[in-house]
């Protein structure tokens, strides 16, 4: 509950929450860049999920204008039953955005900014449904380019002695140790 409250504060522009968030972003980005360097990778832009938090209102407006949003238990969803998928949650009942909302904002930002031919999402296979839902919502908004341009590349998990790795449980292997 405390984490949700802080996230809501951040989404509503609370200065203390944003300062704490920025501190975490800076530390995380420094560590990510170190890992990327070990892999021989570098990026021109580092725009994390939180970069898109102020762009979610536009996503909600697009969905409202297209009559795609429905209320469900106080939350806002896009019904995807017709496509054999559960609903795509867009806004929680407290008005906060979620991953899908920010991923939609990221897609529209990236398409407008870079006019990509392909946008690849390389994530764990457990996010397969999430990206299928998000990509379908982009299509439902009349963006035919989404069918061929948005690609999810799922990967498996590294396990330790047959158990799933989890930072919360302390069962972890650091990428730097493997590399």
Where are these regions (language model features)?
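NTP-dependent nucleotidyl-transfer catalytic core
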Residues: 1-179
């Amino acid at each position: 509950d405390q984490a949700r409250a802080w996230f809501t504060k951040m989404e509503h522009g609370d200065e203390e929450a944003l300062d704490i968030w920025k501190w975490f972003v800076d530390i995380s980005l420094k560590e990510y860049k170190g890992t990327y360097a070990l892999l021989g990778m570098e990026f021109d832009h580092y725009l994390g999920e939180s970069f898109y938090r102020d762009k979610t209102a536009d996503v909600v407006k697009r969905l409202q204008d297209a009559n795609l949003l429905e209320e469900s238990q106080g939350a806002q969803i896009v019904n995807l039953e017709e496509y054999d998928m559960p609903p795509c949650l867009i806004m929680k009942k407290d008005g906060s955005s979620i991953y899908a909302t920010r991923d939609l904002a990221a897609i529209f930002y990236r398409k407008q900014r870079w006019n990509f031919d392909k946008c690849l999402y390389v994530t764990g296979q457990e996010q397969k449904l999430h990206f299928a839902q998000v990509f379908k919502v982009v299509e439902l908004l009349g963006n035919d380019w989404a069918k061929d341009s948005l690609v999810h590349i799922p990967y498996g998990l590294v396990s330790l002695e047959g158990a799933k790795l989890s930072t919360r449980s302390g069962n972890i292997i650091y990428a730097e140790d493997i590399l």
